[in-house]
Amino acid sequence: MAVSAIFSQDSNSKRLLIAFAITTLFMVTEAIGGWLSGSLALLADTGHMLTDSAALFIALMAVHFSQRKPDPRHTFGYLRLTTLAAFVNAAALLLIVILIVWEAVHRFFSPHEVMGTPMLIIAIAGLLANIFCFWILHKGEEEKNINVRAAALHVLSDLLGSVGAMIAAIVILTTGWTPIDPILSVLVSVLILRNAWRLLKESFHELLEGAPQEIDINKLRKDLCTNIYEVRNIHHVHLWQVGEQRLMTLHAQVIPPLDHDALLQRIQDYLLHHYRISHATVQMEYQHCGTPDCGINQAAPADGHHRHHHHE
């Protein structure tokens, strides 16, 4: 690992740790304040801050575990733990949303007294904490770490939750209309639900070793046949992801090359540069696949592909 990469990882870890500590501290403070003031909006925003803490923790663990080398028992390393943590966090957040909405409906029809002043103070403090965390995560001009960017987006979305709690507090202080509290708590819960559901689907997809959603495997197979002359057919394609690393195995029927290793390198380079697949295991075959399972993930070149090949 290059020295610059090591310093970058250390910088990411420090910033994520600071943001995680601040967010978690204010999450606990907001939960206590919401319970004491009777504000469901604050409790809903606490759930939203929990999504931020979870996202920051996952990002922090991803940076940490990505520096661990694989061992004989964990040949891909430990990056799958972050995916498992994301799945558990998302499932817990969905449960929190259900509880908040249930309580909001109950509160709307049976209003409770809400202490507007403590609610407003805590909401403002939470907003300032989120602004500071967002600034910490975005500090630096050449930030490229996808985990840090994703965590920053979570914090940014939580700003809306803090603003919602502030609006509810101001309305209660000026008009005494307490139903605004459960109404805004439901709106905040919708934000939580959207993030939690997306996280649940993505983590579940990765745990099932699904292919990265942004890669069209049919297009990938055709691209290999079209852009690499010797490749006649692609089949037995398997693509999955561990953390941020994409892995692939495939069988390629090829014209017998003069240099086997050079052709293999060209295929792997193409997958790396066009699809960011950093680890590809390619089995090259000189005969057409004739076994019953050859149709699995199989692609033949376009009709016009070999018409453009000229043989001396």
UniProtKB/Swiss-Prot annotation:
User: Keyword annotations for this protein?
Assistant: Cell inner membrane, Cell membrane, Ion transport, Membrane, Transmembrane, Transmembrane helix, Transport, Zinc, Zinc transport
Provide an example Pfam family for this protein: Cation_efflux
Q: Does the keyword Membrane apply?
A: yes
| UniProt membrane topology term | Multi-pass membrane protein
| Signal peptide limits | none
Which molecular function terms from Gene Ontology are attached?
zinc ion transmembrane transporter activity
Does the keyword S-adenosyl-L-methionine feature in the UniProt annotation? no
Subcellular localization is given as: Cell inner membrane
Q: What is its main location?
A: membrane
Tell me the InterPro entries matching this sequence.
Cation_efflux (IPR002524), Cation_efflux_CTD_sf (IPR036837), Cation_efflux_TMD_sf (IPR027469), CDF/SLC30A (IPR050681), Zn_transptr_ZitB (IPR023500)
Which residues are listed as membrane-spanning?
16-36, 40-60, 81-101, 117-137, 153-173, 177-197
Which SUPFAM superfamilies does the record associate with it? Answer: Cation efflux protein cytoplasmic domain-like, Cation efflux protein transmembrane domain-like
- Which Gene Ontology cellular component annotation is one that this UniProt entry carries? plasma membrane
Question: Which family, according to UniProt?
Answer: Belongs to the cation diffusion facilitator (CDF) transporter (TC 2.A.4) family. SLC30A subfamily.
Q: Which PANTHER family match?
A: CATION EFFLUX PROTEIN/ ZINC TRANSPORTER, RE54080P-RELATED
- Chain's role: Involved in zinc efflux across the cytoplasmic membrane, thus reducing zinc accumulation in the cytoplasm and rendering bacteria more resistant to zinc. It may contribute to zinc homeostasis at low concentrations of zinc.
**What is the name attached to this protein's record?**
Zinc transporter ZitB
Q: What is the source species?
A: Yersinia pseudotuberculosis serotype I (strain IP32953)
